Each structure stands twice: as structure tokens, then as C-alpha cells.
Amino acid sequence: MSVMYKKILYPTDFSETAEIALKHVKAFKTLKAEEVILLHVIDEREIKKRDIFSLLLGVAGLNKSVEEFENELKNKLTEEAKNKMENIKKELEDVGFKVKDIIVVGIPHEEIVKIAEDEGVDIIIMGSHGKTNLKEILLGSVTENVIKKSNKPVLVVKRKNS
């Protein structure tokens, strides 16, 4: 029985470890991989934290509701993600992949698992740690939860040793 990984899910938070994982995604082209689902999840919990923080500081504006502020923040974060993903998408297309890019707002590990299922990917390739990169822990919480909850194979790429 031969295992083929034709369709890859590459979730990124644009961290250094995610960049290292991208190199591994590209290497799968030599193994006949054809398509990459490029995913960025805007963490809805972070948006809620920023809402509270901004309201406490009063920078949300006197005439804005929490909902308006939340929508502005989601739009801003989505626009930033689109710009970063455009470069990654081009890199992947340059090595011959068909690329579908997705940006969603939600709980990162839940969205990664859901999109892996919805898109019918063969493997998930992701970094071991995200932006927090706590050195004391073996795996980041998003990666750990994806491993626990997904029925897809997960290739976890380690961060650089420091």
C-alpha cells in the first residue's frame, strides 16, 4: 500500500516556526503533492481581549459600539493576513502547487480540524509552536489540540533550537 499526500493543509500564524514548516510543505512537491490549502485563523478570543482592553483605555471611540470595534478589528486583521498570505501563496505556486487560501475567525485548533475535514486533505503540516513560542513546553496548545482532535496525519515541524 502506497501512501500519497496529494492535498496538504498548511495552517500558518506567520511565526518563525510556521516559516520552517513552509519549507517542509514545499518539499512535499517532490513526493507528488499537488495542492495546498493555505489557512490563517484569526483567534476570536484575541479579538475579545482587545475589545475589553480598548474599552478600558477608551480608545475604541466614544461613538463606537463593541460590535463596530470588533468588526473593524476583524477587517484590519483579515487585511493584514491577506497581505502576508499573498507572498506565501506565490511561493507555493512558484514550486508548482495549486493553492487555495482561506482566512477565518474562530478558535484556531477547531477551525484547522474542521477545514482539514471539509477540504479532504491528506495531511496537515504545521509548526510545533506559534507566536508565543514558550520554550518550556513541548508543543504549543494549538498543535497539541490538532493532533488530539484530527483524524488526519499531522506533521509537526520543530522550532529552531535556541
UniProtKB/Swiss-Prot annotation:
GO molecular function: ATP binding
Principal subcellular localization: cytoplasm
Keyword Cytoplasm on entry: yes
GO cellular component, one term: cytoplasm
Cofactor notes: Binds 1 Mn(2+) ion per subunit.
Keywords: ATP-binding, Cytoplasm, Nucleotide-binding
Compartments in which it is found: Cytoplasm
Subunit structure: Homodimer.
The keyword ATP-binding is annotated on this UniProt entry: yes
InterPro entries xref list: Rossmann-like_a/b/a_fold, Universal_stress_UspA, UspA
Organism expressing this protein natively: Methanocaldococcus jannaschii (strain ATCC 43067 / DSM 2661 / JAL-1 / JCM 10045 / NBRC 100440) (Methanococcus jannaschii)
Cofactor list: Mn(2+)
Protein name: Universal stress protein MJ0577
Similarity annotation: Belongs to the universal stress protein A family.
Pfam families per record: Usp (PF00582)
Binding residue positions for ATP: 11, 41, 127-133, 141-143
